[in-house]
A protein has these predicted regions:
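Bacterial Sec-dependent N-terminal signal peptides
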Residues: 1-10
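GH16 jelly-roll
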Residues: 30-272
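Sec-dependent signal peptide cleavage junction
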Residues: 19-34
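Hydrophobic h-region of N-terminal signal peptides that target proteins for export
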Residues: 9, 13-20
């Protein structure tokens, strides 16, 4: 989700558009139910299935006490990641951290991520989610690796992003060695903030293919990410990107994005 340079924070004792179009459907196996019904599937070898009815998976964590610089008007706050009603909620609110304040940062958001040492490579990444709807914000599901997390690598990233200003569309994007500019907006034909749907991307050496409810909707080829990555989701408010997101309207805050499950099925070409 456009992970740029990270600014660590210590305060009050707390440490914190694309290539290609729709082609013939690829041969990939999706989780049951395009609308996020009960999915009883064990994680495949070297993959995972995170069922948020079962709270925070052991392989994951919530970011806390720091913020991304540049376009992020948000500090990550671990208590903004909650588990209720058999779902994970990521919350975004006017900054209300536990006694700390960061000059120039107005909002507290949420970020869910796998541990730094848990890296995932080629394969099918799926999420059952419902994004937040409000001007100036982003809800996401993505893979990321870069120079700001140990072990340090080049910045590679693959994104599924919902711009809160128009949740009838989803944005796909990717970065290769810090170079982005591959944004592609897909018109869903429905308001994603009103119900759960399955969004996915199949990452292979020669292509990234994005899906909505099992339907192929976009493909990128050419110079693509190659580096095993963490899996992440976040909800944040932007700044200085009004043309992209619209100005933040916090009159309806707090807002939340919800997730029922995430799944990764490794490709035969993935690093083990």
């Amino acid at each position: 989700m456009k992970m740029k340079k990270i600014a660590s924070v210590v305060s009050a004792g707390v440490m914190a558009m694309g290539i290609g179009a729709s082609l013939a459907p690829a041969s990939v196996a999706f989780a049951d139910s395009p609308y996020c019904g009960t999915v009883e599937k064990a994680a495949p070898e070297n993959g995972f299935f995170f069922d948020f009815a079962k709270k925070m998976p052991q392989e994951t964590q919530a970011s806390h006490g720091w913020c991304n610089v540049d376009m992020f008007d948000t500090i990550w706050y671990k208590d903004n990641v909650t588990f209720n009603s058999k779902r994970m909620q990521l919350h975004l609110d006017v900054e209300d951290g536990p006694g700390w304040s960061i000059p120039g940062i107005n909002y507290s958001g949420a970020e869910f991520r796998t541990f730094n040492q848990n890296r995932y490579h080629y394969g099918l990444y799926e999420v059952c989610m419902k994004p937040a709807k409000s001007d100036g914000i982003v809800s996401s599901f993505f893979t990321y690796t870069g120079p700001y997390d140990e072990p340090k690598t080049q910045w590679d990233e693959i994104d599924i992003e919902f711009l809160g200003k128009d949740t009838a569309k989803v944005q796909f994007n990717y970065y290769v060695d810090s170079k982005g500019g591959h944004e592609y907006l897909y018109d869903l034909g429905f308001d994603a903030s009103e119900d759960f749907h399955v969004y996915a991307f199949d990452w292979e050496p020669d292509a990234i293919t994005w899906y909505v409810d099992g339907k192929e909707v976009h493909k990128a080829v050419g110079n693509l990410p190659v580096t095993p990555s963490m899996v992440m989701a976040n909800l944040w408010a932007g700044k200085g990107v009004d043309e992209w997101l619209n100005p933040v309207d916090d009159s309806d805050f707090p807002v939340q994005a919800e997730y029922k499950w995430m799944k990764y099925t490794p490709s035969e070409k993935a690093d083990k």
